[in-house]
Amino acid sequence: MFLKKILERNSAMVDAVVRLHQANQIPANAYVLDLDTIIENVRLMADKAHECGMKLYPMMKQIGRNPVAVQAVQKAGADGFVCVDMADARRIHEAGGKIGHLGHLVQVPKAETAAAVAMKPAYWTVYSYEKAKEISDALPAGQIQKVMARIYAKGDTYYTGHEGGFPAEDIVEVAKKLDAMPGLQFAGLASFPTQLFDETSETVKHTQNYQTILKAKEKLEEAGFTDIEINAPGTTSSHLFEEMGKSGVTQVEPGHGMTGTTPVHALRDMAEKPAMVYVSEICHFYQNRAYAYGGGMYIDPVFPPYKVCACVGSDPDEAKQTIVECDIPNPAAIDYYGIFHEDVRIKTGDTVVFGFRAQAFVTRAYVVPVSGIASGKPHVEGVFDSDGKKTGWPSC
C-alpha cells in the first residue's frame, strides 16, 4: 500500500537498500530506516508543533526502539519521547533520550516503579489511584512527579485491551486526590485514540475521546485548575497540529507520522516523506514461485486486506521495474517466508523491498539505520534487533 509513494517520493531509499543488501552490508529480514528523511520529518513536525504551542513526543516502538534513531530524533527537535511500556523506556533512557511521557498505553508494573521513577519522566499517566500511590510511595523525598489522568466516557473508542482509566465525570475529584498524594502533581489528561483514519472520507478524524478530554479540561478550569496538559495521540502528523493546538492540545505523539507511514501518507503527498522499508532476499523456488525470508512480515492492519507487492532485483533499476505480488502469511502463522506470485524475472539472491506499515517491536526482524541516503553516500549505522540492542551481525 505504501510502496507506490515510496517509489514516487523516496526512490533513493530503495536504490540505497538494494545496493547495500547486494554488498552484504545489511541482512535479509531487516527494517531499514532512512535517517536523513526521519530527521527532516521530525524537524518539520517539531517546528509546527512548537509554533502551535505543543510539545512533540515521538513514539519509537514501531522502528524498534532504535538508539541511533532516538539520538537523531532528539537532535532534530523532539521534546522527549512517549514510551509505550517499560521496555521502551529502558531503551530510550539508555540511548540518552528524554522520557516525555510514560504509563500510556501500558502502565508501569509495580516492581518496576522505582526504576521508572529514577528515569524522571516529564509526565506519567495513571489509570487508577492504586497505580498513582505506587508512584507516590516510590518517590524519594523532595522529588515531584507530574501525573496525567487517563479518562473515559460512555461512547469513547478503544482498541480491544486498551480500555481503562477514571470516569470523566469524576475528573475534578480525581485531580484533587492525585494532587493530595505525597510527591504527585496533577498535570493533565490523556486518552487514546483521539484520532483515527476514516476509510470513507480517507481523512483523519477525531474520535469522541478527543471531545471527552477537552470537555474534562473545561470542568477542571471551572474548578480553578490551570496549565492543564492535554495529551491527544493517534494517527498524528503535522497536518493536524494547527487545529489541535487551537483546541487546547499541548502534547502530540507522532509514530508513523515520523516515517511517513500513516494511512493518509499512503494515499496522498503529505509534508512527511516515506522513511522506512522492509528488506528481504529471495532464497529458493517451489513450483516456480519464489520464496523470500520472513521474520518481519507483520503488516499493521490499518487498511482492509490489500494486494501486497514488493520490488525484486539485484540492482536498483531492475528492482524498481520488477514489482511482484507476494502472499504474506496470516498473522496467526509464523512468517518464515513470503511467497511471490510466479515471475520469470526473479532470481535467487535478489533483494526484496517492501513498503508497508510496520511495528518492528512485535517482530524478530533486524533494524538497520542508514545515514547519507539524501547525499548519495549511504552508510550503515549498525545492525540492531527489534528491541533496540546492537547485534554482531553477521556473526553472533
What is each model feature region?
Residues 238-316:
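Active-site loop ensemble at the mouth of alpha/beta enzyme cores that anchors a bound cofactor
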Residues 153-270:
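Active-site loop/helix belt of alpha/beta enzymes
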Residues 55-198:
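Active-site-proximal beta-alpha core segment in soluble small-molecule metabolic enzymes
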Residues 20-51, 55-57, 62-75, 84-91, ...:
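N-terminal capping/small domains of soluble enzymes
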Residues 42-52, 101-106, 174, 209-223:
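Alpha-helix-loop-beta-strand connector modules within alpha/beta enzyme cores
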Residues 289-396:
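C-terminal accessory subdomain/extension
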Residues 1-8, 12-33:
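Generic N-terminal amphipathic, Lys/Arg-enriched alpha-helix
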Residues 22-34, 118-124, 158-165, 200-208:
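Glycine-rich tight-turn/loop motif centered on a GG-T
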